[in-house]
């Protein structure tokens, strides 16, 4: 590569020999160039000399004194078809001090596709002349070329010569040359990167006329977007204010585009820009406000959204359909149905023509909240407005009616769809089929399924899932399993919902082994269980007494990346509570709090019970007080748990204090509350107090239950007044309260303690006749009664009967049998002495 110097005469003599025979003194027609013939002759001569490579420096007294700068550029242009010759001539002219135009040689090279060479020549110019050289040169020698201008701008930007790049752009636009958008954007980026936003503001009007709108992003929008992306918010806002104060025209459309981008994740910056627009222009329109209203609604900041809505109205801008629908939808999604409906009514009152989408979404909100009455009102208003429902509207109403159990009304809506020539969607069918299945009408559900197939609608996994769930809830598990296999035959992939339905169905039938088989199938089919799956399987393990397995499943959820919900925690906590392992239950509750899972009042009630089981009275009291002072209101179960807990630990004064608090609640004491207190009074032999409490129950309208009567009967049975127990037993039956096996056991126990074993046996038979299954307590009472009076054979027979019915003896019964030591041959399994018939 050559590095040029205009003072290097030695180089000139080496590279350019005399060529007097080639060139003659030329007569120019005028100052702008050669005649056509002379130009061609000069170009041909130079081309020949350069190709032969045998010329020295042109004679300075002849050529140098007559060939001016503009003439040099004309020679370059005449060599356009021979770019290599033109390049060598350009270099000679540069060395000769002719100051050839770089624009001209760039024009020649680019026209011939020699972009890399042009880049190198520009680099040479920078090396020799520095960044201050005249890039355009004698540009007036030829009309501007957009490609060359683009090239020069990009070269200048590459070297940080952003002011020269802008100069080229401005000059070209003044002459009507349109620079490609991408080049203008790159120049703007370079100006912004060089912190020369002031130059953009100075020439903003030229940039706006530079052809980058309306097909592209405006200069204003581009600059703001770039500055905001760099985090230079203040500079962006200052730029906007500057161009507005200088009187440049900025369209509100440009501002709206910037606001839309900012409202996604920079809502506060968008708010500042809007404030500036309101302060210095341009005049906002309804889209401007709707953009930010939508941004606030998506963030749930409804107060700010509504404030902006009011500002829009105050500035005389009438909200349109988009404004109202955006704000209404925001209120509904935030659960503020009242405000949403108020705005909905306001829009109708002001004559805003709400469309079917707004009406349908409004109906959908009320359907989802269970307020079908209001949904119907909105539907009627829609019809009054002359707006025809579409399939989506009808489907939403069908779903709501099905959820409300009004399946035949829903089917009527389905008829409306067909009558109006509309095509039901797959969601329409799934909603109706689900409605039929949930009301137990599987036949109609499957009939609709068949109709759907006949009409050419292929059922999806949702439809199949609904039908499988319907079969499972009806206990038709073999049909449910076969239908699931049919899904696989249709190449429909089973999902977790289908498996959950099957597992739940087997659990309802107490077929836990089958439920676990389905659970294992999920792994075979590559279906990942969800929290609901694990919770159901945990219940299976708990019901079979396998708490460790349930705990393993619980922690397996964490290993699989699942977050157990409140129901999963509650299921396990309650299980450990019932199995007298309160410490583990409390540890699980602590884990629940650490994982920030919100506990409902049911979980809190279990925790209170656990605390009392662990004798942590102060903690239970503190927990209860926190509930009262916090957002979660204790329910009747909470109060009853507290009263029962204090009573179990003989803290009757505290129990009475909670009882007094309960009296002033909106719900007050119930039957369970009074039964707890009656039980405590009976245990403390305060029969007068227990009878008085029983009377209060009748006065307050609380109906005693079998447990209430059982407490009183137990006290009478253990005292000398066994007849009192009989009277209460008869009274309970007269009032239509069915005695439980516990009630019968109390009477049997009282009779056995008095040696009235035959009467006790009759009562035992009455319990069986009443379809009650005697538990180990009932059997143990009567067996011990037989043993006490020496009727060991009958005791053995009853024991054998107990085993045949699947009731396992407890430790208390085993000790009683050991004490009376009946003959082993009587107690051996399989021996049956038929001296007295026993009930089957």
Swiss-Prot record:
Disulfide bonds: none annotated. The keyword Cell cycle does not apply. It comes from the Eukaryota. The keyword DNA repair does not apply. PPR repeats lie at residues 98-128, 145-179, 180-214, 216-250, 251-284, 285-319, 320-354, 355-389, 390-424, 425-459, 460-494, 495-529, 530-564, 565-599, 600-634, 635-669, 670-704, 705-739, 740-774, 775-809. InterPro entries: Pentatricopeptide_rpt (IPR002885), PPR/CCM1_RNA-binding (IPR051222), TPR-like_helical_dom_sf (IPR011990). Keywords: Repeat. Belongs to the PPR family. P subfamily. This is Putative pentatricopeptide repeat-containing protein At1g31840.
